[in-house]
Amino acid sequence: MPLTALVRQLQQVPLTGEVLERSRRPDRLRLQGASRGARALLASAMARCEGAPLLVVVPTLEEAGRWAALLELMGWPTTQLYPTSEGSPYEAFDPTSEITWGQLQVLSELVDEQGDGWQGVIVATERALQPHLPPPAVLADQCLTLRKGASIDLEELAANLARLGYERVSTIEQEGSWSRRGDIVDLFPVSAELPVRLEFFGEDLEKLREFDPATQRSLDAVDLVRITPTGYGPLVADALRANLPDQLDQLLNAEAMEQLLAGDTPEGMRRLMGLAWQQPSSLLDYLPGHTLLVLDERRQAMAHGQQWFDHAEQHHGDEVDGLLPPTLHRPISDTIEALEAFAGFDLAELAETDQHPNSFDLNSRAVPAYPNQFGKLAGLIKDFQREKTRVWLLSAQPSRAVALLEEHDCITRFVPNPGDQPAIERLIEQNTPVALKTKGTAELEGLQLPAWRLALITDREFFGQQNLTASGYVRRRR
Protein backbone atom coordinates (compact mmCIF):
# COMPACT_ATOMS: atom_id res chain seq x y z
CA MET A 1 0.00 0.00 0.00
CA PRO A 2 2.51 2.59 -1.18
CA LEU A 3 0.30 5.66 -0.81
CA THR A 4 -0.22 5.07 2.93
CA ALA A 5 2.74 7.34 3.67
CA LEU A 6 1.30 10.15 1.51
CA VAL A 7 -2.06 9.91 3.28
CA ARG A 8 -0.27 10.07 6.64
CA GLN A 9 1.64 13.18 5.51
CA LEU A 10 -1.57 14.89 4.39
CA GLN A 11 -3.15 14.09 7.77
CA GLN A 12 -0.33 15.93 9.54
CA VAL A 13 -0.71 19.16 7.52
CA PRO A 14 -2.78 21.75 9.49
CA LEU A 15 -4.65 22.70 6.29
CA THR A 16 -6.28 19.25 6.21
CA GLY A 17 -7.81 19.87 9.64
CA GLU A 18 -9.01 23.32 8.54
CA VAL A 19 -10.70 21.88 5.44
CA LEU A 20 -12.28 19.19 7.61
CA GLU A 21 -13.61 21.91 9.90
CA ARG A 22 -15.18 23.65 6.90
CA SER A 23 -17.01 20.42 6.03
CA ARG A 24 -18.97 20.78 9.28
CA ARG A 25 -20.68 24.00 8.14
CA PRO A 26 -24.42 23.87 7.33
CA ASP A 27 -23.68 24.28 3.59
CA ARG A 28 -22.08 21.12 2.21
CA LEU A 29 -18.41 21.60 1.34
CA ARG A 30 -17.30 21.17 -2.27
CA LEU A 31 -13.62 20.49 -2.98
CA GLN A 32 -12.95 21.29 -6.63
CA GLY A 33 -10.16 21.56 -9.13
CA ALA A 34 -8.26 18.28 -8.63
CA SER A 35 -7.56 15.07 -10.53
CA ARG A 36 -9.01 11.75 -9.40
CA GLY A 37 -5.77 10.77 -7.65
CA ALA A 38 -5.64 14.02 -5.68
CA ARG A 39 -9.32 13.72 -4.75
CA ALA A 40 -8.80 10.15 -3.52
CA LEU A 41 -5.76 11.14 -1.44
CA LEU A 42 -7.58 14.02 0.25
CA ALA A 43 -10.76 12.02 0.87
CA SER A 44 -8.69 9.27 2.54
CA ALA A 45 -6.67 11.74 4.62
CA MET A 46 -9.77 13.57 5.87
CA ALA A 47 -11.56 10.33 6.75
CA ARG A 48 -8.49 9.04 8.61
CA CYS A 49 -8.26 12.35 10.51
CA GLU A 50 -11.83 11.75 11.67
CA GLY A 51 -11.17 8.08 12.42
CA ALA A 52 -14.22 7.32 10.28
CA PRO A 53 -14.96 4.73 7.58
CA LEU A 54 -15.54 6.11 4.09
CA LEU A 55 -18.18 5.71 1.38
CA VAL A 56 -17.37 7.26 -2.00
CA VAL A 57 -20.36 7.70 -4.33
CA VAL A 58 -19.48 8.13 -8.02
CA PRO A 59 -21.62 8.51 -11.18
CA THR A 60 -20.85 5.21 -12.98
CA LEU A 61 -19.62 1.68 -12.29
CA GLU A 62 -16.62 2.26 -14.58
CA GLU A 63 -15.58 5.25 -12.47
CA ALA A 64 -16.16 3.19 -9.30
CA GLY A 65 -13.65 0.60 -10.52
CA ARG A 66 -11.01 3.31 -11.04
CA TRP A 67 -11.63 4.78 -7.58
CA ALA A 68 -11.46 1.36 -5.89
CA ALA A 69 -8.10 0.58 -7.55
CA LEU A 70 -6.71 3.91 -6.27
CA LEU A 71 -8.05 3.58 -2.73
CA GLU A 72 -6.51 0.10 -2.42
CA LEU A 73 -3.10 1.83 -2.47
CA MET A 74 -3.94 4.10 0.47
CA GLY A 75 -3.70 1.84 3.50
CA TRP A 76 -7.36 1.11 4.25
CA PRO A 77 -7.99 -2.15 6.18
CA THR A 78 -10.51 -3.18 3.51
CA THR A 79 -11.43 -1.62 0.16
CA GLN A 80 -14.65 -2.82 -1.42
CA LEU A 81 -16.42 -2.05 -4.69
CA TYR A 82 -20.20 -2.27 -4.31
CA PRO A 83 -21.65 -3.24 -7.72
CA THR A 84 -25.15 -2.31 -8.91
CA SER A 85 -27.33 -3.08 -11.92
CA GLU A 86 -28.52 -0.54 -14.48
CA GLY A 87 -31.74 -2.48 -15.07
CA SER A 88 -35.18 -1.71 -13.68
CA PRO A 89 -35.84 -3.22 -10.23
CA TYR A 90 -39.23 -4.43 -11.51
CA GLU A 91 -37.78 -6.79 -14.14
CA ALA A 92 -39.08 -10.35 -13.95
CA PHE A 93 -35.50 -11.64 -13.70
CA ASP A 94 -33.01 -11.07 -10.91
CA PRO A 95 -29.65 -9.32 -11.60
CA THR A 96 -26.68 -11.53 -12.48
CA SER A 97 -25.25 -13.58 -9.63
CA GLU A 98 -21.89 -11.75 -9.97
CA ILE A 99 -23.53 -8.46 -8.94
CA THR A 100 -25.55 -10.02 -6.11
CA TRP A 101 -22.52 -11.87 -4.74
CA GLY A 102 -20.40 -8.72 -4.93
CA GLN A 103 -23.04 -6.86 -2.91
CA LEU A 104 -23.24 -9.64 -0.32
CA GLN A 105 -19.45 -9.60 0.06
CA VAL A 106 -19.70 -5.96 1.19
CA LEU A 107 -22.85 -6.40 3.28
CA SER A 108 -21.50 -9.44 5.16
CA GLU A 109 -18.63 -7.30 6.41
CA LEU A 110 -20.97 -4.50 7.54
CA VAL A 111 -23.41 -6.88 9.24
CA ASP A 112 -20.70 -8.96 10.94
CA GLU A 113 -18.96 -5.90 12.38
CA GLN A 114 -22.34 -4.65 13.65
CA GLY A 115 -21.62 -1.26 12.15
CA ASP A 116 -19.39 0.56 14.60
CA GLY A 117 -16.39 -1.79 14.33
CA TRP A 118 -16.06 -1.44 10.56
CA GLN A 119 -13.25 0.87 9.40
CA GLY A 120 -13.00 0.23 5.67
CA VAL A 121 -13.85 2.10 2.49
CA ILE A 122 -16.61 1.34 -0.03
CA VAL A 123 -16.96 2.74 -3.54
CA ALA A 124 -20.44 2.67 -5.06
CA THR A 125 -22.60 4.43 -7.63
CA GLU A 126 -25.63 6.51 -6.67
CA ARG A 127 -27.71 3.42 -7.58
CA ALA A 128 -26.57 1.86 -4.28
CA LEU A 129 -28.51 4.59 -2.47
CA GLN A 130 -31.79 3.44 -4.03
CA PRO A 131 -33.88 0.94 -1.99
CA HIS A 132 -32.90 -2.53 -3.22
CA LEU A 133 -31.96 -4.52 -0.09
CA PRO A 134 -33.72 -6.38 2.73
CA PRO A 135 -33.68 -4.58 6.11
CA PRO A 136 -30.31 -5.00 7.90
CA ALA A 137 -31.86 -6.93 10.80
CA VAL A 138 -33.39 -9.47 8.39
CA LEU A 139 -30.10 -10.12 6.59
CA ALA A 140 -28.17 -10.27 9.88
CA ASP A 141 -30.56 -12.93 11.23
CA GLN A 142 -29.95 -15.11 8.16
CA CYS A 143 -26.14 -14.84 8.14
CA LEU A 144 -24.04 -17.52 9.84
CA THR A 145 -20.57 -17.02 11.30
CA LEU A 146 -18.62 -20.22 11.95
CA ARG A 147 -15.63 -19.80 14.27
CA LYS A 148 -12.77 -22.12 15.08
CA GLY A 149 -13.52 -24.14 18.23
CA ALA A 150 -17.31 -23.74 17.96
CA SER A 151 -19.64 -26.70 18.52
CA ILE A 152 -21.78 -27.30 15.41
CA ASP A 153 -24.38 -29.95 14.61
CA LEU A 154 -23.53 -31.10 11.06
CA GLU A 155 -27.12 -32.06 10.23
CA GLU A 156 -28.33 -28.65 11.38
CA LEU A 157 -25.56 -26.98 9.34
CA ALA A 158 -26.69 -28.91 6.24
CA ALA A 159 -30.29 -27.77 6.78
CA ASN A 160 -29.19 -24.16 7.24
CA LEU A 161 -27.08 -24.21 4.07
CA ALA A 162 -30.01 -25.59 2.07
CA ARG A 163 -32.28 -22.87 3.50
CA LEU A 164 -29.78 -20.17 2.48
CA GLY A 165 -29.73 -21.46 -1.10
CA TYR A 166 -26.47 -23.47 -1.15
CA GLU A 167 -26.36 -26.51 -3.43
CA ARG A 168 -24.79 -29.77 -2.29
CA VAL A 169 -22.31 -31.12 -4.86
CA SER A 170 -19.59 -33.76 -4.99
CA THR A 171 -16.73 -31.31 -5.75
CA ILE A 172 -16.61 -27.57 -5.06
CA GLU A 173 -16.11 -25.55 -8.24
CA GLN A 174 -18.02 -22.29 -7.82
CA GLU A 175 -19.71 -20.06 -5.26
CA GLY A 176 -22.94 -21.16 -3.62
CA SER A 177 -22.05 -24.85 -3.30
CA TRP A 178 -20.91 -27.20 -0.54
CA SER A 179 -19.89 -30.82 -0.08
CA ARG A 180 -19.25 -33.22 2.78
CA ARG A 181 -16.87 -36.15 3.15
CA GLY A 182 -17.14 -37.65 6.63
CA ASP A 183 -16.05 -34.98 9.11
CA ILE A 184 -14.79 -32.60 6.40
CA VAL A 185 -17.12 -29.98 4.92
CA ASP A 186 -16.07 -27.92 1.90
CA LEU A 187 -18.00 -24.69 1.47
CA PHE A 188 -17.79 -21.79 -1.00
CA PRO A 189 -19.64 -18.79 0.53
CA VAL A 190 -20.85 -16.31 -2.10
CA SER A 191 -19.35 -13.51 0.00
CA ALA A 192 -15.82 -14.99 -0.08
CA GLU A 193 -13.02 -14.98 -2.64
CA LEU A 194 -11.96 -18.57 -1.92
CA PRO A 195 -13.77 -21.69 -0.66
CA VAL A 196 -13.18 -22.90 2.90
CA ARG A 197 -12.52 -26.40 4.26
CA LEU A 198 -14.04 -27.12 7.68
CA GLU A 199 -12.52 -30.02 9.62
CA PHE A 200 -14.57 -31.36 12.53
CA PHE A 201 -13.77 -33.64 15.44
CA GLY A 202 -17.19 -34.86 16.41
CA GLU A 203 -19.18 -31.62 16.60
CA ASP A 204 -16.18 -29.38 17.35
CA LEU A 205 -14.86 -27.26 14.49
CA GLU A 206 -11.11 -27.90 14.75
CA LYS A 207 -9.68 -26.28 11.60
CA LEU A 208 -10.75 -23.76 8.98
CA ARG A 209 -8.60 -23.45 5.88
CA GLU A 210 -9.05 -21.73 2.55
CA PHE A 211 -8.36 -24.00 -0.42
CA ASP A 212 -7.79 -23.74 -4.15
CA PRO A 213 -10.88 -25.03 -6.02
CA ALA A 214 -8.74 -25.93 -9.07
CA THR A 215 -6.28 -28.21 -7.23
CA GLN A 216 -8.33 -28.85 -4.03
CA ARG A 217 -5.15 -28.13 -2.01
CA SER A 218 -5.50 -26.42 1.36
CA LEU A 219 -4.09 -22.90 1.69
CA ASP A 220 -4.05 -20.45 4.61
CA ALA A 221 -5.78 -21.08 7.93
CA VAL A 222 -8.58 -18.68 8.92
CA ASP A 223 -10.32 -18.08 12.24
CA LEU A 224 -13.87 -17.69 10.97
CA VAL A 225 -16.05 -17.88 7.88
CA ARG A 226 -19.09 -15.70 7.18
CA ILE A 227 -21.96 -17.37 5.35
CA THR A 228 -24.63 -15.22 3.72
CA PRO A 229 -27.65 -16.33 1.67
CA THR A 230 -26.80 -16.99 -2.00
CA GLY A 231 -29.06 -14.08 -2.92
CA TYR A 232 -31.97 -12.00 -1.67
CA GLY A 233 -34.50 -14.44 -3.13
CA PRO A 234 -34.61 -16.83 -0.12
CA LEU A 235 -35.19 -13.88 2.26
CA VAL A 236 -37.98 -12.44 0.10
CA ALA A 237 -39.58 -15.87 -0.27
CA ASP A 238 -39.54 -16.45 3.52
CA ALA A 239 -41.17 -13.06 4.14
CA LEU A 240 -43.86 -13.69 1.50
CA ARG A 241 -44.69 -17.14 2.88
CA ALA A 242 -45.16 -15.59 6.33
CA ASN A 243 -47.73 -13.12 4.99
CA LEU A 244 -49.12 -14.03 1.56
CA PRO A 245 -50.27 -10.80 -0.19
CA ASP A 246 -53.51 -10.93 -2.17
CA GLN A 247 -51.94 -9.87 -5.49
CA LEU A 248 -49.27 -12.59 -5.40
CA ASP A 249 -51.40 -14.91 -7.60
CA GLN A 250 -51.39 -12.28 -10.35
CA LEU A 251 -47.65 -11.62 -10.14
CA LEU A 252 -46.49 -15.26 -10.15
CA ASN A 253 -47.52 -18.02 -12.53
CA ALA A 254 -48.92 -21.28 -11.18
CA GLU A 255 -45.56 -23.09 -11.28
CA ALA A 256 -43.72 -20.31 -9.42
CA MET A 257 -46.53 -20.09 -6.86
CA GLU A 258 -46.32 -23.82 -6.27
CA GLN A 259 -42.54 -23.56 -5.80
CA LEU A 260 -42.95 -20.74 -3.30
CA LEU A 261 -45.55 -22.59 -1.22
CA ALA A 262 -43.39 -25.74 -1.27
CA GLY A 263 -40.55 -23.82 0.38
CA ASP A 264 -38.42 -23.21 -2.72
CA THR A 265 -37.31 -19.88 -4.20
CA PRO A 266 -38.63 -19.15 -7.72
CA GLU A 267 -36.81 -16.79 -10.12
CA GLY A 268 -37.56 -13.07 -10.00
CA MET A 269 -38.09 -12.55 -6.27
CA ARG A 270 -36.27 -9.21 -6.20
CA ARG A 271 -39.15 -7.24 -7.70
CA LEU A 272 -41.42 -8.51 -4.89
CA MET A 273 -39.22 -6.95 -2.20
CA GLY A 274 -41.76 -4.13 -1.75
CA LEU A 275 -44.43 -6.72 -0.86
CA ALA A 276 -42.14 -8.60 1.52
CA TRP A 277 -41.20 -5.47 3.50
CA GLN A 278 -43.01 -2.17 3.71
CA GLN A 279 -39.81 -0.21 3.06
CA PRO A 280 -36.79 -1.98 1.51
CA SER A 281 -33.37 -0.65 2.53
CA SER A 282 -30.44 0.93 0.72
CA LEU A 283 -26.71 0.67 1.38
CA LEU A 284 -26.99 3.74 3.63
CA ASP A 285 -29.07 1.75 6.15
CA TYR A 286 -26.17 -0.70 6.63
CA LEU A 287 -23.50 1.94 7.32
CA PRO A 288 -22.35 3.07 10.78
CA GLY A 289 -23.69 6.50 11.70
CA HIS A 290 -20.20 8.07 11.77
CA THR A 291 -19.34 7.08 8.18
CA LEU A 292 -17.93 9.91 6.05
CA LEU A 293 -19.86 10.15 2.75
CA VAL A 294 -18.13 11.67 -0.25
CA LEU A 295 -20.09 12.46 -3.43
CA ASP A 296 -17.87 12.72 -6.50
CA GLU A 297 -19.13 14.80 -9.46
CA ARG A 298 -22.58 15.64 -8.09
CA ARG A 299 -23.95 16.97 -11.39
CA GLN A 300 -23.08 13.80 -13.30
CA ALA A 301 -24.38 11.56 -10.51
CA MET A 302 -27.71 13.41 -10.43
CA ALA A 303 -28.03 13.25 -14.23
CA HIS A 304 -27.40 9.47 -14.26
CA GLY A 305 -29.74 9.00 -11.30
CA GLN A 306 -32.55 10.99 -12.93
CA GLN A 307 -32.24 8.98 -16.15
CA TRP A 308 -32.45 5.69 -14.24
CA PHE A 309 -35.39 6.95 -12.14
CA ASP A 310 -37.34 7.89 -15.29
CA HIS A 311 -36.71 4.41 -16.73
CA ALA A 312 -37.76 2.65 -13.50
CA GLU A 313 -40.86 4.86 -13.17
CA GLN A 314 -41.94 4.10 -16.74
CA HIS A 315 -41.27 0.38 -16.37
CA HIS A 316 -43.24 0.26 -13.12
CA GLY A 317 -46.22 1.91 -14.81
CA ASP A 318 -46.08 -0.20 -17.99
CA GLU A 319 -45.25 -3.67 -16.71
CA VAL A 320 -46.51 -4.01 -13.16
CA ASP A 321 -49.92 -2.42 -13.70
CA GLY A 322 -50.22 -1.16 -10.12
CA LEU A 323 -49.80 -4.59 -8.53
CA LEU A 324 -46.47 -3.71 -6.90
CA PRO A 325 -45.91 -0.71 -4.63
CA PRO A 326 -43.34 1.76 -6.08
CA THR A 327 -40.91 1.20 -3.21
CA LEU A 328 -37.82 0.10 -5.20
CA HIS A 329 -37.11 3.51 -6.75
CA ARG A 330 -37.21 7.03 -5.40
CA PRO A 331 -36.45 10.46 -6.88
CA ILE A 332 -32.78 11.39 -7.04
CA SER A 333 -33.51 14.43 -4.84
CA ASP A 334 -34.66 12.09 -2.04
CA THR A 335 -31.55 9.96 -2.52
CA ILE A 336 -29.23 12.97 -2.22
CA GLU A 337 -31.15 14.15 0.85
CA ALA A 338 -30.58 10.76 2.51
CA LEU A 339 -26.88 10.96 1.64
CA GLU A 340 -26.56 14.46 3.12
CA ALA A 341 -27.82 13.19 6.48
CA PHE A 342 -24.27 11.81 6.91
CA ALA A 343 -21.18 13.95 7.44
CA GLY A 344 -19.12 14.45 4.31
CA PHE A 345 -18.38 16.65 1.32
CA ASP A 346 -18.55 16.81 -2.48
CA LEU A 347 -15.69 16.50 -4.96
CA ALA A 348 -15.35 17.88 -8.48
CA GLU A 349 -12.55 17.68 -11.04
CA LEU A 350 -13.22 21.10 -12.56
CA ALA A 351 -13.52 24.38 -10.69
CA GLU A 352 -17.05 25.74 -11.07
CA THR A 353 -18.18 29.38 -10.96
CA ASP A 354 -21.70 28.93 -9.59
CA GLN A 355 -21.16 30.94 -6.39
CA HIS A 356 -21.44 27.87 -4.15
CA PRO A 357 -21.41 29.19 -0.55
CA ASN A 358 -18.90 26.62 0.74
CA SER A 359 -16.38 25.65 -1.94
CA PHE A 360 -12.61 25.23 -1.73
CA ASP A 361 -10.41 25.29 -4.83
CA LEU A 362 -7.66 22.67 -4.50
CA ASN A 363 -5.79 24.14 -7.48
CA SER A 364 -4.25 20.75 -8.25
CA ARG A 365 -1.99 20.58 -11.30
CA ALA A 366 -0.65 17.79 -13.46
CA VAL A 367 3.08 17.11 -13.48
CA PRO A 368 4.66 17.53 -16.95
CA ALA A 369 5.49 14.16 -18.50
CA TYR A 370 9.03 13.72 -19.88
CA PRO A 371 9.19 10.00 -20.77
CA ASN A 372 12.78 8.72 -20.51
CA GLN A 373 14.14 12.30 -20.35
CA PHE A 374 15.70 12.05 -16.91
CA GLY A 375 17.68 15.27 -17.24
CA LYS A 376 14.45 17.26 -17.52
CA LEU A 377 12.81 15.23 -14.74
CA ALA A 378 15.81 15.83 -12.47
CA GLY A 379 15.53 19.58 -13.12
CA LEU A 380 11.80 19.46 -12.35
CA ILE A 381 12.41 17.66 -9.04
CA LYS A 382 15.14 20.15 -8.07
CA ASP A 383 12.69 23.01 -8.74
CA PHE A 384 10.19 21.34 -6.39
CA GLN A 385 12.90 20.99 -3.74
CA ARG A 386 13.80 24.68 -3.98
CA GLU A 387 10.11 25.50 -3.36
CA LYS A 388 10.19 23.23 -0.24
CA THR A 389 7.66 20.90 -1.87
CA ARG A 390 7.70 17.30 -0.61
CA VAL A 391 8.36 15.07 -3.63
CA TRP A 392 7.18 11.46 -3.84
CA LEU A 393 8.18 9.05 -6.61
CA LEU A 394 5.87 6.10 -7.26
CA SER A 395 7.17 3.47 -9.66
CA ALA A 396 7.00 -0.23 -10.48
CA GLN A 397 10.82 -0.09 -10.79
CA PRO A 398 11.89 2.49 -8.19
CA SER A 399 15.55 1.38 -7.96
CA ARG A 400 16.01 2.03 -11.68
CA ALA A 401 14.27 5.42 -11.46
CA VAL A 402 16.46 6.45 -8.50
CA ALA A 403 19.66 5.35 -10.31
CA LEU A 404 18.73 7.23 -13.51
CA LEU A 405 17.96 10.43 -11.59
CA GLU A 406 21.24 10.11 -9.68
CA GLU A 407 23.12 10.27 -13.01
CA HIS A 408 21.81 13.84 -13.28
CA ASP A 409 22.83 14.87 -9.74
CA CYS A 410 19.30 14.43 -8.39
CA ILE A 411 19.51 12.50 -5.11
CA THR A 412 16.43 10.47 -4.21
CA ARG A 413 16.00 7.51 -1.87
CA PHE A 414 14.04 4.29 -2.33
CA VAL A 415 12.25 3.05 0.81
CA PRO A 416 11.41 -0.67 0.27
CA ASN A 417 8.86 -0.76 3.09
CA PRO A 418 6.15 1.94 2.76
CA GLY A 419 5.29 1.34 6.42
CA ASP A 420 8.79 2.37 7.57
CA GLN A 421 7.55 5.64 9.02
CA PRO A 422 10.79 6.77 10.79
CA ALA A 423 12.86 6.42 7.59
CA ILE A 424 10.28 8.29 5.51
CA GLU A 425 9.94 11.06 8.11
CA ARG A 426 13.73 11.49 8.23
CA LEU A 427 13.96 11.82 4.43
CA ILE A 428 11.11 14.35 4.37
CA GLU A 429 12.81 16.46 7.05
CA GLN A 430 15.96 16.43 4.88
CA ASN A 431 13.89 17.54 1.84
CA THR A 432 14.91 14.34 0.02
CA PRO A 433 12.42 12.86 -2.49
CA VAL A 434 11.04 9.49 -1.36
CA ALA A 435 10.67 6.67 -3.91
CA LEU A 436 8.13 3.90 -3.26
CA LYS A 437 7.30 0.74 -5.17
CA THR A 438 3.82 0.25 -6.61
CA LYS A 439 2.08 -2.56 -8.43
CA GLY A 440 -1.40 -3.12 -9.78
CA THR A 441 -3.52 -1.49 -12.46
CA ALA A 442 -4.60 1.73 -10.76
CA GLU A 443 -4.82 4.69 -13.16
CA LEU A 444 -2.43 7.05 -11.42
CA GLU A 445 -0.66 10.06 -12.87
CA GLY A 446 1.59 12.74 -11.46
CA LEU A 447 -0.02 15.53 -9.47
CA GLN A 448 0.78 18.65 -7.51
CA LEU A 449 -1.13 19.99 -4.51
CA PRO A 450 0.48 23.42 -4.04
CA ALA A 451 -1.51 24.27 -0.90
CA TRP A 452 -0.18 21.10 0.77
CA ARG A 453 3.31 21.50 -0.78
CA LEU A 454 3.14 17.99 -2.22
CA ALA A 455 4.15 16.59 -5.61
CA LEU A 456 3.75 13.00 -6.83
CA ILE A 457 5.63 11.67 -9.87
CA THR A 458 4.65 8.29 -11.38
CA ASP A 459 5.72 5.91 -14.15
CA ARG A 460 3.64 7.97 -16.57
CA GLU A 461 6.09 10.86 -16.16
CA PHE A 462 9.17 8.60 -15.93
CA PHE A 463 8.54 6.15 -18.76
CA GLY A 464 5.32 7.23 -20.49
CA GLN A 465 3.45 4.24 -19.07
CA GLN A 466 -0.34 4.15 -19.52
CA ASN A 467 -2.53 1.72 -17.59
CA LEU A 468 -5.55 0.19 -19.32
CA THR A 469 -8.33 -0.93 -17.00
CA ALA A 470 -11.51 -2.90 -17.58
CA SER A 471 -14.62 -0.75 -18.03
CA GLY A 472 -17.11 -3.21 -16.52
CA TYR A 473 -17.46 -4.94 -13.16
CA VAL A 474 -15.48 -8.14 -12.64
CA ARG A 475 -15.77 -9.63 -9.18
CA ARG A 476 -12.37 -10.08 -7.60
CA ARG A 477 -11.23 -13.63 -6.91
CA ARG A 478 -7.89 -14.88 -5.74
Give the predicted meaning of each segment.
Residues 1-478:
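ASCE RecA-like P-loop NTPase motor cores
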